[in-house]
Design a protein with these regions (language model features):
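Acidic-enriched, low-complexity/disordered segments with a strong bias for Aspartate over Glutamate
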Residues: 27, 39, 60-63, 93, ...
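Generic structural signal for well-ordered secondary structure
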Residues: 35, 55-57, 85, 105
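Small beta-barrel nucleic-acid-binding modules, principally OB-folds
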Residues: 51-67, 72
Length: 128
């Protein structure tokens, strides 16, 4: 399997509803909740790509460009952006759409770096 095929197969998509218990005082998705969801999707993507134990080592620039109101549907999309020897970068985008209208907007984008670990919790090669 080629690297591009492996990247395509590991792309992860999850849909969620934004309920009021996940919002802030502006009735939009709380940023910390968005980051938690993004890290989870990034973890799943990294694990599906490598099929190894993976841990988050950093979250790079996170851009919140569009509010995510309560009562909307979001899609989180995780995709491998770069593969190093023992680490990989995963881009996660959150798209928001109204429940009863067409269209959607990209609301949040972030890059997460993961390291693959062996059974001794030491960095291990991703591509063998």
């Amino acid at each position: 399997m080629t690297l591009e095929e492996k990247i395509n197969l590991s792309e992860t998509r999850v849909f969620k509803t934004v309920f009021p218990n996940n919002t802030n005082h502006y009735d939009t998705l709380f940023g910390g909740t968005a980051l938690s969801m993004m890290d989870e999707i990034a973890f799943i993507t990294a694990t599906r790509f490598s099929r190894l134990r993976c841990v988050t080592v950093s979250s790079d620039r996170i851009d919140f460009t569009h509010p995510i109101p309560a009562g909307t549907i979001i899609e989180l999309v995780g995709r491998i952006e770069h593969v190093g020897k023992t680490s990989m970068k995963v881009r996660v985008d959150i798209f928001v759409e109204q429940m009863y209208q067409e269209g959607r907007d990209k609301a949040v984008t972030g890059i997460f770096t993961f390291v693959a670990l062996d059974e001794n919790h030491k960095p291990t090669a991703i591509l063998r």
